[in-house]
C-alpha cells in the first residue's frame, strides 16, 4: 500500500509522457485484417482478446467513447509482463486517438488486485480522458463478468469465481451485437457512481 501511495505522490504526467514516448505515437491507418467475431478460451487467448479489442477500437473510424466494466481477476493476466506492456500501450493508443474512457472499477477486489490496478491506471487518469466509476454494495461473488464496448467493437466475458482459467470471452464487431452490448454498458454506467474527479490544473 505504502509503495503504491508513494508512486502516486511522486507521479509527474510530463515525465510519464516522455518515458513512454506518448507524443511520438502514431495511430495506425493501414487496415489490418481483424475478425468480425471470435471466441477466446483460457488465459492465453483471453490476453489476445483484450489486445484484439483495443486493436479494433484504435483502427476503427469511430470516435465514440469506450465503456469498460470488469470484475475478472487481474493478477494472473498481469503475470505475463509482455502482455501487460502491450495492454498499457494499447490503452495509450486509445487515448492518443482522442477517445474518452468510462471505466467502472470493482472496488471489492482483493487488495493486491486493487493496488495493481491503481498503479497502472492512475498515470492514465492524469490525461483527463478517463472517468472512473464504481458500483455501490457488495457484488455477486459467484460469477465474474466483463463488458467492454467502443464505437465498432464489443467484448463480453464470464467465469465462475475462482476459476478464471476456464473463462470465456467473446469479441464482436457485428453492428447489432455491438449495439446491444453498448446498451448494457450504458445501463451499468447509470447504476454506477463517480469514483473520483480528475483535474489537470
Give the location of each predicted region.
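Generic structural signal of hydrophobic/aromatic residues within well-ordered alpha-helices
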Residues: 4, 54, 118-121, 181, ...
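A structural signal for short, well-ordered beta-strand segments and their strand-loop junctions
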Residues: 66-69, 100-105, 133-134, 147, ...
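HKD (HxKxxxxD) catalytic microenvironment of the phospholipase D
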Residues: 134-178
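Signature of lipid phosphatidyltransferase scaffolds
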Residues: 161-201
